[in-house]
């Protein structure tokens, strides 16, 4: 019996962009949000939570030969992003890991709890990339909107749950979080929450599952899995913009412009005709 096009669409737009993130004995989930070729190289980016990769971020006192003294030096260790392979759409048959670099982050202690990874595979684009909810349409997200949470719950291959947006005005460490009833648990952190757009006929990424409600019970605490906090898409966009990666969602900004803002060199192939004219002069 043929698989329903609706089921295929859900797999391709929500399930397959999900990756598992492993970082020095800890782990969680991530979502592929961009994968394009610029010049001769592919550039693939994954969004996750800071607390998923925090063990790979440290600051050490190291000798600076120019300043002639020990200075705080940021050390970023390698992170591993795991893609999954499936048979008949739904049956996971394994995974393969690719090294990735932490290129931007905001610490969990500051309330933001966000990180951006760049996959080191420069030859092959990611096969599936999440559709991002348009920044100009955020005011049309409401309580009772159906949603789906997808992530590597408890370290498993991706698991999908459904629910609805149930609260949009909680503040944790002075930053706004939204809440959904789509069940999430440890390991979902860094994954994705999706909402279907009737207008654009696609499932769209609207936030990062980041926290779960915990109820103290005597000497232990029980997780309330149907009350999960997620970082709303508006904050995700602000973080990307603050770190000069807004080409990921903003069509008015180019990859090259953002790279220049970050002080990175742009390959000649990416500079276009203006670069060629400069060389001729």
PLM region spans:
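Short, surface-exposed secondary-structure boundary micro-motifs
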Residues: 49-51, 152, 198, 211
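A generic structural motif
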Residues: 44-48, 113-121, 178-180
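Serine endopeptidase catalytic core focused on the charge-relay Asp
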Residues: 24, 54-57, 70-172, 206
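Short, solvent-exposed loop/turn segments that connect beta-strands within catalytic domains
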Residues: 36-43, 68, 89-94, 110, ...
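C-terminal cap/linker of serine protease catalytic domains
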Residues: 2-9, 59-76, 205-281
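Catalytic histidine site
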Residues: 9-76
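Active-site region of chymotrypsin-like
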Residues: 14-19, 24-28, 120-131, 157-241
